[in-house]
Amino acid sequence: MYRLLAMKRFFIKYMVAVLLIMVAAKAIAQPKAVQDSLAKANTLYATGEYDKAAQLYEAILLKGFESKELYYNLGNACYKSNQITKSIINYERALKLSPKDEDALYNLAIAKKMIVDNIETLPEPGFLRWWKDMIAALTTDQWATRSVVAFLFFLGLFGLFLFTTKAGIKKLSFWFSLLFLVYSIFTFSFASSQKSRLTGSDKAVITERSLSVKGSPSETGTELFIIHEGLTVQITDQLGEWIEIRIADGNKGWVKENSMVKI
């Protein structure tokens, strides 16, 4: 009886955690007014009025609505109106929501050819790249759904293990329940990772025309190197108004927070 009560409490806590992740990740349905604004912005873009289209896309974002398509369209409008840095920011935001989107990846690569800095990227370890790709293969909701389904299978099989008297079934149900539990835990962690990636800000785009990167979080810090507008950097630490960044070649330093836009 005690084991059943403990399982029930564990199940409730687990389901609440999974549902919270799913609710937090669920996109807000677009009301008709937003759909109309989006259609108008798309029409403006199609007729070559890129500045007006960009303004309308931004107005939709200010209302609290976002999607990969919206950021991608805004990136295109900014690029067409020669706002290269803003186009990079929005392509990066589109890729944050959909890391494998080929159109956004291609257009981002084109936009980055227009900026001053061309920094060679350090190769990422194969296993780490594979791990990130695996997590990014599904959305937060999809991972969370798999976690719930696997956990339900675990409960059913573990219940069978507890109550069956047949040795063969008892053994099989135990090992299969363990397998589903492990899968459920992994998929839950993948859902959590996806949620953290979507809600966190560990990347930024430099908005200063030319920026001195310091060796310490101070105006009097030693100048390490110079970077320029449009460069995407990794945020590694923050101390007040100073942010420690890492660029693609691995070099690190400190810059002011107001010199960048977080992704």
PLM regions with names:
Residues 120-162:
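Membrane-embedded alpha-helical segments of integral membrane proteins
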Residues 170-194:
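Internal/C-terminal transmembrane anchor helices
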